[in-house]
Amino acid sequence: MASTTSTKKMMEEATCSICLSLMTNPVSINCGHSYCHLCITDFFKNPSQKQLRQETFCCPQCRAPFHMDSLRPNKQLGSLIEALKETDQEMSCEEHGEQFHLFCEDEGQLICWRCERAPQHKGHTTALVEDVCQGYKEKLQKAVTKLKQLEDRCTEQKLSTAMRITKWKEKVQIQRQKIRSDFKNLQCFLHEEEKSYLWRLEKEEQQTLSRLRDYEAGLGLKSNELKSHILELEEKCQGSAQKLLQNVNDTLSRSWAVKLETSEAVSLELHTMCNVSKLYFDVKKMLRSHQVSVTLDPDTAHHELILSEDRRQVTRGYTQENQDTSSRRFTAFPCVLGCEGFTSGRRYFEVDVGEGTGWDLGVCMENVQRGTGMKQEPQSGFWTLRLCKKKGYVALTSPPTSLHLHEQPLLVGIFLDYEAGVVSFYNGNTGCHIFTFPKASFSDTLRPYFQVYQYSPLFLPPPGD
């Protein structure tokens, strides 16, 4: 307790009587009292303080006179104050009032010299605070290092998780867009199928109705003829004997000769049938049920195109020599037609485009322009889809229609319904609808059409591959 009392006494001696705090930059005057330099200076600047004579003042405590020039720094007192500040920060034992200078290794706590002698610490390993401080400081620093590493890992994992969240949301959004797009394409496909089937049904209805109405009209004429004969016979029966017997044999012969011709039976069985569930769940199977084999026609190939021996692959290369200048050959662009011509029915064929960066695919009229002035648009007899680096996927309508596909088709399917005037494009791998041209009216032979780009060969797989 003596140590505590001594410390309190020194604190009182080091306290400025003006600001009542530990002195800052202490200075002493002639009488021996000390003050903060700033406090004593400000004190005598106060107009209420009376001067004894020029630059002479009274000590605030003892009223002894002193001259302002006699202020001198008290370094010894300053050092004491710093020591007191450090001592004031040190922890003391609540039970004994002594400072903690010892550390009990067994209990892991700070103790004073009196605690060390108490029964509860008897036999415990103790050491001076300054002796064990460095060791525990190193342990704490190691713990800090470990925790910082964990914090860094936590931060990395947090960033990684944030990135995963973003990636997951993007993935879900892409899938959401794909689902919407696929269903929209499927709805478009089903709508086109519905129109096609309804058109076929209407055509079948009109054909059968026409035959039935023709037969109905014939029966009307025959009914009138029979009524005329009946009336003639009834008049004879109601007349005189002479009228009845006049040309009676001829009348009877004509009557018995009248027959009701049986027309060829008109079937009421419908041929236009549609299994909607099958269309809905198996588009690819439906398309491939109309698949035909397509090969390339070398007589129409542009001079820069190289055809394989089986005529199923075409590549763009250098000008081919020894080629005729047939009017059937394309000269404006590197194009080639398929050998097969379509004049009726439904047809479907596929083109393996791979990861090529450009191509034009579709069908065209047999008599399209193949030289200067060639335009790929329906008005000129072309129904084609294009992929190019600058504009991506484009349907060559008039004007062109930009397409936004969620996945790159490696296999493109082209579907033609000649009677319905429909040309549609599909992703051959998934069956997803890509685009359908507005309804057209075909009157000429249609042929598969291909335009080949540099480093983007095209391959025509046989049906069923």
UniProtKB/Swiss-Prot annotation:
Q: Which CDD domains match?
A: Bbox2_TRIM5-like, RING-HC_TRIM38_C-IV, SPRY_PRY_TRIM38
Role noted for this protein = E3 ubiquitin-protein and E3 SUMO-protein ligase that acts as a regulator of innate immunity. Acts as a negative regulator of type I interferon IFN-beta production by catalyzing 'Lys-48'-linked polyubiquitination of AZI2/NAP1, leading to its degradation. Mediates 'Lys-48'-linked polyubiquitination and proteasomal degradation of the critical TLR adapter TICAM1, inhibiting TLR3-mediated type I interferon signaling.
- Modified residues annotated as Phosphoserine in this record: 70
The subcellular location is: Cytoplasm
Q: Where, by tissue, is this protein expressed? A: Ubiquitous.
Q: Which species is this UniProt entry from?
A: Homo sapiens (Human)
Give the GO cellular component terms, alphabetically.
cytoplasm; cytosol
What biological-process GO terms show up in the record? innate immune response; negative regulation of defense response to virus; positive regulation of canonical NF-kappaB signal transduction; positive regulation of DNA-binding transcription factor activity; positive regulation of NF-kappaB transcription factor activity; positive regulation of viral entry into host cell; positive regulation of viral genome replication; proteasome-mediated ubiquitin-dependent protein catabolic process
Question: According to the UniProt record, what class of enzyme is this?
Answer: transferase
Alphabetically sorted, this entry's keywords are: Cytoplasm, Immunity, Innate immunity, Metal-binding, Phosphoprotein, Transferase, Ubl conjugation pathway, Zinc, Zinc-finger
What name is this protein filed under?
Answer: E3 ubiquitin-protein ligase TRIM38
Q: Which reaction does it catalyse?
A: S-ubiquitinyl-[E2 ubiquitin-conjugating enzyme]-L-cysteine + [acceptor protein]-L-lysine = [E2 ubiquitin-conjugating enzyme]-L-cysteine + N(6)-ubiquitinyl-[acceptor protein]-L-lysine
